[in-house]
Amino acid sequence: EKQIAPARTFCLLSEVAGLEKQGLIKGGNLGNAVIIVDTAIDNKEVEFFKERFGIKFYEGTRGLYKSQILRFKNEPVRHKTLDLIGDLALLGKPILGHVTAIKSGHKGNVEFAKLLRKEFKDQF
């Protein structure tokens, strides 16, 4: 619980504006999310993030947002693990086995949970 639970969600800077327009990051802030600057940004984008989110980026910056420090060097992987644990908990029963996930996300996790529920319906 101390190795997985503290892992924050993360997103790529290139996705932030789209997520915001879809209303998907209403509770997101620099305390509960890690922003990975995956693309060089221009002055127009710098102003957008400053005005909309109060975040000051610098043109051409890449990597983690300047003031952020990862809680673990592999924090994004740990958060994906946390997502998987949470999504599979929706089954309402423990999984007696080993799960390996590659490039997982909520959509795939939920589909996997549905498949398990269908396959083992007599045990639910």
For each of these PLM feature ranges, what is it?
Residues 1-124:
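Short acidic-hydrophobic catalytic motif
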